Amino acid sequence: MSTDIEGLPQEDINELVDETIAENEVVLFMKGTAIAPECGYSETALHHIRRHRDDVECVDILHSDEEFRAALERHSGWTTIPQAYVDGEFVGGADVLEELDERGELADALNA
């Protein structure tokens, strides 16, 4: 998914983030794409999700405006990227996904 939101008011950006989270069972807001992650944390998060599911919506926010990041923070309370959501609920970033995977709990968390 592209995040070309330049010039949109914050309310519209908030709505776009809300819709993306609501319309996808598993969504990962990351730096880069599923094919070419642009940071190690995004690559780690995607790796752990893909161990259990192939169907994940990846949203590249690398070049997004601060308003887009603010909309994400409104959902999660976190300022860091990546951020994973399952069934509309914030799960965590790379470290949380890795920990859940190591404990054998990630598959359940991802509805896999």
Which role fits each region the language model picked out?
Residues L16-D55:
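Local sequence-structure signature of Cys/Sec-based thiol-disulfide redox active-site neighborhoods
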Residues L72-T80:
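Thiol/disulfide oxidoreductase modules built on the thioredoxin-like
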Residues R53-F68:
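Thiol-based oxidoreductase modules, predominantly thioredoxin-like and allied folds used
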